[in-house]
Structures are given as C-alpha cells and as structure tokens.
Amino acid sequence: MLLVLLSVVLLALSSAQSTDNDVNYEDFTFTIPDVEDSSQRPDQGPQRPPPEGLLPRPPGDSGNQDDGPQQRPPKPGGHHRHPPPPPFQNQQRPPRRGHRQLSLPRFPSVSLQEASSFFQRDRPARHPQEQPLW
C-alpha cells in the first residue's frame, strides 16, 4: 500500500515538476465580478441579463431592421419552451455581490529525492540480505 502511495506521489511530483516551467499561475486566477465592476468601460453600465423573452439590441439600433425571427415569451398552454440563456459579453458570468479574486494556492517545489526521503524516514532501512526471498 505504501509502495503504491509512494509511486502515485512520485508520479504526480514528476509530472508537476516537468510542467511547472510552462505554468503561469495567473492563468488560473479568475474574478467573480461585482454588480458595480470597475473594470468595465465608463460608457457601459453594469451587465444585466435582459428580461425573459427579449433579445438585447446593440446601442443605436432603431429596431426597424429585420434581424430574423424574434423570440417571444411562450404562450400559455401547449409546450413550455424556455428561451436559451442570454449571451454575456466576453463570456462573463452574471454580476454577483462582492468582488473576490480567487486563485490556486502556490506550493513550494519538492524534488523527487526529498519526497522519497520523506517516506523513507518512517521505517528503518533494510539491507538486501535481510529481505525475504519470495
């Protein structure tokens, strides 16, 4: 059991160490926007989903142009279809309360020798002639 655990840890450490040079920790940082997000451009208001059943229109669009079929709220009775969720600009999530920035923890680098010596400390060293022959 200990051998399996040691193998898994060593494999994880070796793969993490080999990819550590390519990893940029800022890639794993994401932001949960808040209702009044200061990163938005000043000409934009807070991004909120449009009322159900209505399509958002870009500013300056008079609405007289034919943009294809319009979505309408479902009529009472019959099949109840839910409209697809509205697209958000820049694929952001809807605004939420608070502005938090979450990131993955940064662990120190550990060499394979350090990991194996950590597991070898707990049991006494065996000499080759003391090992059972099975």
From Swiss-Prot:
One Pfam family matching this protein: Pro-rich
Comp. bias regions, Polar residues: 110-119
Compositional bias per record (Basic and acidic residues), positions renumbered to this chain: 120-134
Cellular component annotations (GO), alphabetically ordered: extracellular space
Biological processes per GO annotation: visual perception
Extent of the signal sequence: 1-16
Top-level lineage group: Eukaryota
Keywords from the UniProt entry: Secreted, Signal
Chain intervals with Pro residues compositional bias: 47-59
Main location: secreted
Subcellular location: Secreted
Known tissue expression: Abundantly expressed in lacrimal gland where it is found in the acinar cells but not in the intralobular ducts. Also found in the submandibular gland, the parotid and sublingual glands.
The protein's name: Proline-rich protein 4
